[in-house]
């Protein structure tokens, strides 16, 4: 066991009947690290959080938090971690202050003991302190839930898709708050389906269908993209998608914002490709090289894993 790690996961597997929710997961989160689990809904992120927060047991493998085994030392683990589930787990009929007092009582503490830790966050919701939690906006619920998760001064924080369902401004503010908590020495494991949030993490793990597809810094993940990448746009986007996927030299093509991203073999002849599309009746065609991002890498590795593409 490496005590420089806040979390260690060795071969965790969890099944629900015939469904393998987690398949031999292995990763470590270092102390003081902001680590992101990046993947779509159904990837296994929530199951992993429930295992690490000792709510369920694995079928195979081991995990430790703060050097304590999740299977045998779960009571001690629960005293040292904060957990913010995806639905925030607030009591909607209690006010902001009543929710905080309730969670403080659960851990045998009070607001004064954690004032310095939660006050920068609490100040943003203090004007609504007498409002019932069920009447708060998504962003305010998010901040209240984070305060509740921090009320007992945990050393490790688990955040399961904390920015889902909140506006873009609240999302950005939340990541700023996480950076401040990291600076105070708290180790953070956060999951998100938003690929753009990956860049706010020290390291990330790409996860899909219960398997880890890669672990590295965001920059390291992107540098592993190993094929030419183009953006494609035209007057018939659906038709272009089908035509591009059938073209020799195109490894894969997928919608990406207002364009399609086109992954090709090396030596791909872009001029000939445009000429072919024009001859097939497409017009206003734009094709230009772009740099890969986290989402491109995720799609590439997901297709490699499933065998749907011969990229790389």
Across the structure, where does each feature detected by a protein language model lie?
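C-terminal coupling/interaction segments
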Residues: 264-312
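ABC transporter nucleotide-binding domain
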Residues: 176-265
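Short, surface-exposed acidic/glycine-rich loop or hinge patches that mediate macromolecular interfaces
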Residues: 68-71, 212, 235, 267-268, ...
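Short phosphate-engaging motifs
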Residues: 21, 197, 239-240, 269, ...
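Conserved protein kinase catalytic domain
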Residues: 78, 222, 298-299
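ABC transporter nucleotide-binding domains
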Residues: 7, 14-207, 214
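ABC-family P-loop ATPase nucleotide-binding domain
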Residues: 1-13, 304-312
């Amino acid at each position: 066991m490496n005590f420089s790690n806040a979390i260690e996961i060795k071969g965790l597997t969890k099944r629900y009947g015939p469904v393998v929710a987690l398949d031999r997961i292995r990763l470590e989160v270092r102390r003081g690290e902001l680590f992101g689990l990046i993947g779509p809904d159904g990837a296994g992120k929530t199951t992993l959080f429930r295992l690490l927060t000792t709510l369920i047991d694995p079928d195979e493998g081991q995990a430790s938090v703060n050097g304590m085994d999740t299977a045998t030392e779960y009571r001690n683990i629960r005293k040292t971690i904060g957990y913010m589930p995806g639905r925030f787990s607030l009591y909607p009929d209690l006010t902001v202050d009543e929710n905080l007092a309730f969670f403080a009582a659960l851990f045998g503490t009070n607001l004064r003991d954690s004032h310095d830790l939660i006050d920068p966050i609490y100040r943003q919701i203090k004007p609504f302190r007498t409002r019932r939690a069920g009447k708060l906006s998504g962003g305010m619920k998010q901040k209240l839930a984070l305060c509740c998760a921090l009320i007992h001064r945990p050393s490790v924080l688990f955040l399961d898709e904390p920015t889902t369902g909140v506006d873009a401004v609240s999302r950005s503010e939340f990541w700023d708050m996480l950076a401040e908590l990291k600076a105070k020495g708290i180790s953070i494991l956060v999951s998100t389906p938003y690929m753009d949030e990956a860049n706010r993490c020290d390291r990330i793990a790409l996860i899909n269908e219960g398997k880890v597809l890669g672990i590295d810094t965001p920059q390291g993940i992107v540098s592993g993209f190993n094929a030419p990448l183009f953006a494609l746009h035209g007057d018939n986007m659906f038709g272009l998608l089908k035509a591009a996927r059938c073209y020799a030299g195109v490894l894969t093509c997928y919608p990406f914002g207002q364009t399609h991203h086109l992954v090709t073999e090396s030596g791909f002849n872009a001029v000939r490709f445009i000429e072919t599309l024009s001859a097939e009746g497409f017009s206003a065609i734009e094709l230009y090289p772009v740099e890969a991002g986290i989402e491109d890498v995720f799609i590439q590795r997901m297709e490699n894993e499933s065998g749907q593409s011969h990229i790389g």
